[in-house]
Amino acid sequence: VNNTIETNKTAATRFIEAFNTDDWDSVREVVAPEYVLHHPMGGTAQLGPEGMVGVWSNFKAALPDSWHPIPVMIAEGDHLAVLLPTYGHFTGDPYHGIPPTGKWLEYGMVNIVRLEGGKVAEGWFGMDPLAEMQQMGAAPSPPPRQLNEIEKENVELFQQTINTAGSEFDNLTAFGDVVIALGPPQHAEDARKRKVDIYRATNGSLELASSHEFTTNPPYAGDPSANTQISRAVVKRFFDDVLIGHDLDALAEIASLDILIHPTAMPCEASYFGINGVGGWLEESWKAFPDLTIADYFTVAQGDIVAVRWAARGTSRGNFLMLPPTGEVVEYTGVSMYRIEGGRIAEIWETRNTLGIMSQLNPEIGGGHHAH
């Protein structure tokens, strides 16, 4: 079994590196003739190798310097899951009718692939096309979260007492008495490491509460000492009791006190922190769709990492991103990745098709047909 997993990881790595280096012949070699892609915007399409080359070469024509590092890659059986950030400048050709803006793009994907005979046979791309459009400058971006006075003071305390070397970060933010430093910046010379440091302020000083580092070459493959079945059971309970059952008491039993959420799967993004932050994040969705449920989900797990592709359904009863309720049922999909620490969820990278939700609430918005 391990030989198959290593063969599959080699094929998947070649597949991604082929995108990074415009090596379309390698794509043709590692993609199965009947390759099927499930994409949040384009639906399901049997592309085969040539179709996949077309999808990726179109994207590279629009963002010539775009690339995917691979911070996390796990495998189980004939399935494999990757955390796949996207970086690049929109300086090339128009992309799906959007003229190039020169903007720097940073957004995340969580992808699950199925391999057959050492070739990529099926792929589920998890990404938020709205985030892609916002990064391209084709849709308005929400304003960044404003720090309160205590949070600003704690960031300043971090800069004065912890970051004495004056290091740069992808993101430096605070939630109450907690400071979160994510880095290094992706333009740094050695961007193969992704580090999350969480500090807690007590009595005027900052103490390190937790620290986690991924290398992107080779990618993190899950902690071999962690029990895969325990990790899977914790995530299953999150889906069954919290996402389906709307039970926030259960969340307190299965989430770390320092749980961190990256809502568009971007490693440098830190939008929700702690059990209260996660509860607030979930309640935003439940206010818009009070009967929101997960209709179906599938997991891939290795060590302390679990990836899940899922389909959600709910009735529009409240505002969603300024769009009024319609009373209609909305359906959407996503792929998420979870890191487990001490039997609790410590980190979530989430992708969901926000643009698809918006286009169902207001068809004039249009779903678009992106295939990256």
Regions found by a protein language model. Give the residues of each.
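C-terminal and inter-domain tail/linker signature
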Residues: 1-372
